[in-house]
Amino acid sequence: MLKSNKVVLIGAGGVGSSFAYALTIDNSLVHELVIIDVNENKAKGEVMDLNHGQMFLKKNINVLFGTYKDCINADIVVITAGLNQKPSETRLDLVDKNSEIFKDIITNVVSSGFDGIFVIASNPVDIMTYVTMKYSKFPIHKVIGTGTILDTSRLRYFLSDRLNVNTQNIHSYIMGEHGDSSFATWDETKIAMKPLSEYLAEGKITEIELDEIHKKVVNAAYEVIKLKGATYYAIGLGIKNIVNAIIGDQNIILPISSYINGQYGGLVKDIYIGAPAIVCKEGVKEVLNFKISPKELEKFNSSANQLKSYIDKIEF
């Protein structure tokens, strides 16, 4: 059960600050946002900057600088802290360093008495979500990662741009790792009620174009990092959607880092990976186990095995 509609953000860098900004301008439910960062001046500066815009908000939110002690009565702790991906680095290159950072963060949060829901956005997010579950010993439904929510948004944007259809009417997901081994669920994709396969049959789009769209999704982060140094606006909006789904008990389906233990063919077990799930006030209500094609199932297993190979090297 929700306690106080209070969210604690750990990490006041580009992603954390973008989430905080998105939450303040589109907030109807959160009463308090506490920001924590190892760089206390950065956190204090973000708090001041956000509070100075209160006059322009539809609903005020109490934004505060805090410490780990403030987690005790929070409903949600959002973690964006950790080292960022550099040009030419993959997200998986960050495993060792960010695992050590997380061990300290999770220990401090749990020691405060926090018993709410973790939302993880730090990369590699699927592995960091698993790390959070292991270090916190929290139930799996109370540990959520952003997963492929950003990848899915990118996919729908690129497909909507190609077909000239609003993104809200495109029903498709990116599944698997939030990274290079992800895949698009093209065989299940629909534009409103019309299967994508009919668009292909009518010659309105080609298989080659779909492959190019998926490549653009996979390479999007590298491109943005090359151009501006980091990605943060879009993922900030994605985190805000997850938080609102929890606080608002929305029962919305989101492609998050979900705990998989036998779904999708039974081969993938004990791992967090991008898959659609129902998100509500309790965290994850259900991981959807919908039917995907054999080709996509093979990609799902391959992506999971890659993540597993990194997780198995971490000492818990």
Swiss-Prot record:
Activity modulation comment: Allosterically activated by fructose 1,6-bisphosphate (FBP).
Upper taxonomic lineage: Bacteria, Pseudomonadati, Spirochaetota, Spirochaetia, Spirochaetales
Catalyzed reaction equations: (S)-lactate + NAD(+) = pyruvate + NADH + H(+)
Organism the protein comes from: Borrelia garinii subsp. bavariensis (strain ATCC BAA-2496 / DSM 23469 / PBi) (Borreliella bavariensis)
PROSITE patterns to which the protein is assigned, alphabetical: L_LDH
Residues modified as Phosphotyrosine: Y222
Record protein name field: L-lactate dehydrogenase
Assembly notes: Homotetramer.
PANTHER family registered for this protein in UniProt: L-2-HYDROXYCARBOXYLATE DEHYDROGENASE (NAD(P)(+)) (PTHR43128), L-LACTATE DEHYDROGENASE (PTHR43128:SF16)
Pfam families: Ldh_1_C (PF02866), Ldh_1_N (PF00056)
Record-level GO BP terms: glycolytic process; lactate metabolic process
